[in-house]
Amino acid sequence: MDVLFLSRLQFALTACYHWLFVPLTLGLGVVMSVMETIYVVKGDEAWRRIARFWQKLFGINFAVGVATGIILEFEFGTNWSNYSWFVGDIFGAPLAIEGILAFFMEATFIAIMFFGWEKVSKRTHLAATWLTALGTMISAWWILVANAWMQHPVGMDFNPDTVRNEMMDFFAVAFQPAAVIKFTHSVASGWMTGAMFVVAVSAWFLWKKRNEEMAKKSILVASIVGLVGTLLCMFAGDKHGVDIAKNQPMKLAAAEGLMQGSNEAPFSIVPGIEVPHMLSFLATHDWNGYVWGVEDLKQVGEEQIAEGKVALEAFRTYREHRDTNDSIAQQALATFQQHKAYFGYGYLDSTEELVPNVPLCYWCFRLMIGCGCLVALCFVLALFFGYKGWLPRYRWFLLLCMLCLPAVYVAGQCGWIFTEVGRQPWAIQGLLPVKAALSSVSAGSVLTTVILFATLFTALLIAEVRIMLKAIQQHKDEDLVVSD
């Protein structure tokens, strides 16, 4: 195992662990805020107790999510120092704003939310709850701005003297369409996760014939939030597909296992089952739109790599002669400027490196969609059965609700695996390959931290699950007032 593999493994491990907690924080924050709003509007003490119960679980998850997120950010400086130097001027800005604005906002209002029930007015407490939920979404915005920039770099210019990309347009970075789409899709999927968590836990209460009125009320609210999240996720997913087809065509080709481009590209449901023209429509909103295939992009990649080699050689010549021979340096700089759009391709040795792991992208994409559709169906049925008052009657459905909880997590994990693996070999699309972003560290030191982080994160996950299960199992609200 080399340093590159181990560094990627470490980052993938910590990112996947972190994303176990983030979507639940995003979704549960909205659900508990809606519940407290109902309490304030109706004055029903039952809703107050319901909101406080879900806030307790939110707090447990929030604490572990913060711990894993801090470790994740430090990895940019430890294992990926070349990356940090190359794009730190751009990438660091949204992360700094996230830490200064969103995190402090969350830290302030979460304290009022937990400890202010008997100390501030109902409306002040409600505002603190909503601001806590809003803070988590602001935090997600700036993190996703940074990630969107890695997928579609804009608003910067490369300085050959400092060997850094420098931000030229903050608003282009912060509000580019790719960031808006990614934020909407990711946060909406978080709403689905939080809502499914509430539905699943409530289904368990109904299965055990405990806290039944609380469970029924919770399922109604959560299923509505989940359906809103589902619709937003579908809308953003459609926009995301068009954006990928335009800016990351190799990722789309890998997701579909499409080797040869076509004007009538079919959508593959599973190998051997295809819907004619559907991929062309999804990618271009035209039934006969052209979709690039892997082999087509490899042919284009030959020219891009050749251009990149010219840019890389000119850059090295400029750096070598800029202090000793101005004419050679200026000539090299002119050559570099002419070819710099392909500078990152100069680090690649063959077109095979341009192709990500096609089977992994293909199946992760299908698992994401399949599990997402199952969860959406669960929300529809939960809302219908809940409205009719039939929830305790259908025990098979309660079991389905509980089984859909791991499904929503599988969908989220597979979505991010597809997003990041499909971008390979790039750390920053078209600018910096992953292999050029590494720090000068030994394989042994990286392996040690992989083992340490895996142990620590597993311990944190086990601790959270045990604490949550204990809180759920011990919760009693048998005197809940039924309010019509």
Briefly describe each language-model feature range:
Residues 1-484:
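Polytopic transmembrane helical bundles with strong interfacial aromatic enrichment
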